Swiss-Prot record:
Keywords: Cytoplasm, Methanogenesis, Transferase. The lineage of its organism: Archaea, Methanobacteriati, Methanobacteriota, Methanomada group, Methanococci. Binds 2 coenzyme F430 non-covalently per MCR complex. Coenzyme F430 is a yellow nickel porphinoid. Methyl-coenzyme-M reductase is activated when the enzyme-bound coenzyme F430 is reduced to the Ni(I) oxidation state. GO terms for molecular function: coenzyme-B sulfoethylthiotransferase activity. The gene is mcrB. Coenzyme M binds at residue 367. Its EC number is 2.8.4.1. The keyword 4Fe-4S does not apply. It catalyses: coenzyme B + methyl-coenzyme M = methane + coenzyme M-coenzyme B heterodisulfide. Belongs to the methyl-coenzyme M reductase beta subunit family. This is Methyl-coenzyme M reductase subunit beta.
Length: 443
């Protein structure tokens, strides 16, 4: 039995209607089989750069920048023997014949996607088992395949694992995970938010609506883990996922179409008009000047509408510039204008606006330490919004025409190549909708 009466219409990445009157809870991470599968597979999937390992060993460059050790170079045809290495890795990691261990060679054997069996995750406290098991299995496979002696074994280890265990972030290594190391988490429950914007953009191959969906799915699923989407607040996060992340009722696409030649301010006008027309907000009082103050008839839905408008405003503004740099100021001033226009709180009740202030400073302005694409929901600057600030940044980076120093191609090439090989990661919108249709009559 469903807890909420909300029904939504679902649309594909091109804005074509796929389903109508779907229960809101069909997209919940607690019910949707695709989202459940995505979370599980993100935890057990590791990207391996076989070409990088071969190059590191050939040049003696192990452990990252500035770590070239003359005389330690080893010539191995890792790419040429990729199939044998992959088979050996699978045989080491497999718990039982026919289990869900998966090893997939990509790009002619230059990269490898490895999924550890679920049983290894089941007996682990957290997801580090995937990276560590894969790294150790790959090390043994290389040592066995190429008859590496005891004196060069540590060099092979470093070519794979980088500076681990001295650095728990695998600095200079040739394996990667979407989630990163647990030691980097800003707080409890932040693991699914520890995915850089550029990783999401690269994984979805810069598909705008899919990148937004991918980011929103993980950000809002993290809210369930963090205890935010519990009790009275669950519906708020489900509606946010639906309207901002999954383009429910085609709201985002319609806003963008209506403001194709518009501005951030015109998007604000459109979302306010839409909220009034749908009865989401109503006039509270009219001032002597004729200015209307509004109140929400449904505060959670108002937040969801505002969040959808935020993504649309970023698409209009950053899309016009073909550049992502103004995404922070767009998030900030969309909310600022929206609050002045209605007298109501902006997206996430002020948290997204507050996030944008710090985000503006640290993504350019006086400091300018990194572009928008390197931030994530676990970052000390952008962690404060409860799942609503990172999806718009993903939208901006999808539309960037190469203006960024920290581009997805530069920061996320390995992750993008490997994770995009899995359909549900590359096209999450399509498969989450399929999952919703699968369970909608079972709720």
């Amino acid at each position: 039995m469903v807890k909420y009466e909300d029904k939504i219409c679902l649309f594909d990445a091109k804005g074509n209607q796929v389903a109508e009157d779907v229960p809101l809870e069909a997209i919940s991470p607690l019910n949707n089989p695709t989202i459940m599968g995505m979370v599980k597979n993100i935890k057990r999937t590791v990207a391996v750069n076989l070409a990088g390992i071969e190059e590191s060993l050939a040049k003696g460059k192990i452990g990252g920048k500035g770590c070239q050790v003359p005389g330690t170079n080893i010539e191995l045809d890792v790419i040429g023997d990729a199939e044998a290495i992959a088979d050996k890795v699978k045989s080491i990691l497999q718990v039982s014949a026919g289990d869900d261990t998966e090893v997939k060679l990509i790009n002619g054997g230059k990269q490898m996607a490895e999924q550890v069996p679920s049983k290894r995750l089941d007996v682990a406290a957290e997801y580090s088992v995937s990276m560590l098991s894969t790294g150790m299995a790959l090390k043994e496979a290389l040592i066995t395949n190429f008859n590496i002696d005891m004196f060069d074994g540590s060099t092979v280890h470093s070519a794979i694992m980088g500076q681990y265990p001295q650095d728990m972030d695998y600095a200079g290594g040739n394996i990667a995970s979407l989630l990163g190391a647990p030691s980097k988490l800003e707080g409890l429950g932040y693991a699914l938010r520890n995915i850089p914007v550029n990783h999401a953009v690269a994984t979805t191959k810069k598909s705008l609506m899919n990148a937004i969906a991918f980011s929103s799915i993980l950000e809002q699923t993290a809210m369930f883990e963090m205890g935010d989407a519990v009790g009275s607040f669950e519906r708020q996060h489900l509606l946010g996922l639906a309207y901002q992340g999954l383009n429910a009722d085609n709201l985002v696409v319609e806003l963008v179409k209506a403001n194709a030649t518009g501005t951030v301010g015109s998007v604000v006008n459109s979302i306010v008009e839409k909220a009034i027309a749908d009865g989401v907000i109503v006039v509270d009082k009219t001032l002597g000047s004729g200015f209307n103050m509004y109140k929400p008839a449904d505060v959670n839905k108002w937040n969801a509408y505002a969040a959808a408008g935020l993504v649309a405003a970023v698409m209009v503004s950053c899309g016009a510039a073909r550049a992502a740099q103004n995404v922070a100021s767009t998030i900030l001033y969309y909310n600022d204008i929206l609050e002045y226009e209605t007298g109501l709180p902006g997206v996430d009740y002020g948290r997204s606006m507050g996030t944008a202030v710090g985000f503006s400073f640290f993504s350019h302005s006086i400091y300018g330490g990194g572009g928008p694409g390197i931030f994530n929901g676990n970052h000390v600057v952008t962690r404060h919004s409860k799942g609503f600030a990172i999806p718009p940044v993903c939208a901006a980076m999808c539309m960037d025409a190469g203006t960024q120093m920290f581009s997805p191609e530069k920061t996320s090439a390995l992750v993008g190549t490997v994770y995009s090989a899995f359909d549900e990661f590359r096209e999450p919108l399509k498969y989450v909708i399929e999952g919703a249709l699968e369970v909608q009559n079972k709720l």
